[in-house]
UniProtKB/Swiss-Prot annotation:
Name under which the protein is recorded: Lipoyl synthase
Annotated SUPFAM superfamilies: Radical SAM enzymes
Taxonomic classification: Bacteria, Bacillati, Actinomycetota, Actinomycetes, Mycobacteriales
Record CDD domains: Radical_SAM
Provenance organism: Mycobacterium marinum (strain ATCC BAA-535 / M)
Xref: InterPro entries: Aldolase_TIM, Elp3/MiaA/NifB-like_rSAM, LIAS_N, Lipoyl_synth, rSAM
Length: 324
């Protein structure tokens, strides 16, 4: 239900002039939290980053890295890695941590896969991550768009690795199958949080269905990946249990990060997880047998994605040869 902002919600204006949702008004009663000293980055503008920055500006290209203000842009661009958002800037679902707005999406842009592929080519990327909004308004849930973007990138950039971060397509096997057939190097679907708080944080998704998406991708023969965001009300024991669930579901690669609140209308930060806790979670995940693990306050699901894929592929290959 939409409601008008209350006085405490000042500064939490909703996008595109819409009224704040009741949940957003409640969230806005909590001021934006002060970040702890370990949540900081230093700009290291090496030659690769500077070249890409100038090229992106000159060619009018669009990346999530810049438009979302990602703190890791300097490192990723130095490695010739970047992330692209497809499907528009309006999502048909609302997650309480996500900065992408919920609304009625624009009509499907069938030329978008070609433009993304050309951007990858122009930027000379070694590894490209493609993510997008949920498109429940489309008959196929956007499956063609996700699959075609992978196909277009691979056709124009045969040596570039592609990681595809997808919604759950409501668990529909035909839509998931169409996406899997495009065979990205990594198929990612982010669980994001633990079962107890899942419904509150991601009401349009279900925890088990997200696990099932990863299982289906793994059974198809794809390298799988997921992400957990900490600081939204979970306990350390629940994090460990979720890691077990993800590994049992067939997830190869896991990233673990700190929740950073995008605006006052988003879910308040309930806890700042200390760096040493991330080290402990990473060690626990490695002990479970994940092929690739990256955890830290400023890690994002696409952070060092190419390196993590190579690490996972190496471990999977090594494990297969040792078991033989």
């Amino acid at each position: 239900m939409n409601v008008a902002p209350e006085p405490g919600a000042a500064g939490a204006a909703a996008p595109q002039g819409r009224k704040l949702l009741r949940l957003e008004v409640r969230n806005a009663q909590t001021p934006i939290e002060r970040k702890p000293p370990w949540i900081r980055t230093r700009a290291r503008m090496g030659p690769e980053y500077t070249e890409l920055k100038n090229l992106v500006r000159r060619e009018g290209l669009h990346t999530v890295c810049e438009e979302a203000g990602c703190p890791n842009i300097f490192e990723c661009w130095e490695d010739r890695e970047a992330t692209f958002l497809i499907g528009g800037d309006q999502c048909t679902r609302r997650c309480d941590f996500c900065q992408i707005d919920t609304g009625k999406p624009a009509p499907l842009d069938r030329d978008e896969p070609r433009r993304v592929a050309e951007s990858v080519h122009t930027m000379g990327l070694r590894y490209a991550t493609v993510t997008g909004v949920a498109r429940d308004d489309l008959p196929d849930g956007g499956a063609w768009l996700y699959a075609e973007t992978v196909r277009a990138i691979k056709e124009l950039n045969p040596s570039t690795g592609v990681e595809l971060l997808i919604p759950d397509f409501n668990g529909k096997a035909d839509q998931l199958g169409e996406v899997f057939e495009a065979r990205p190097e990594v198929l990612a679907h982010n669980v994001e949080t633990v079962p107890r708080v899942f419904k509150r944080i991601r009401p349009a998704f279900t925890y088990q269905r997200s696990l099932d998406v990863l299982t289906a991708a793994r059974q198809f023969g794809l390298v799988t990946k997921s992400n957990l965001i900490l600081g939204m009300g979970e306990t350390p024991e629940e994090v460990r249990t979720a890691l077990v669930d993800l590994h049992d579901a067939g997830c190869d690669i896991i990233t673990i990060t700190q929740y950073l609140r995008p605006s006052p209308r988003h879910h308040p930060v309930e806890r700042w997880v200390r760096p040493e806790e991330f080290v402990e979670f990473a060690q626990y995940a490695e002990g479970l047998g994940f092929a690739g693990v990256l955890a830290g306050p400023l890690v994002r699901s696409s952070y060092r994605a190419g390196r993590l894929y190579e690490q996972a592929r190496s471990r999977n290959t090594s494990g297969a040869s040792n078991s033989g």
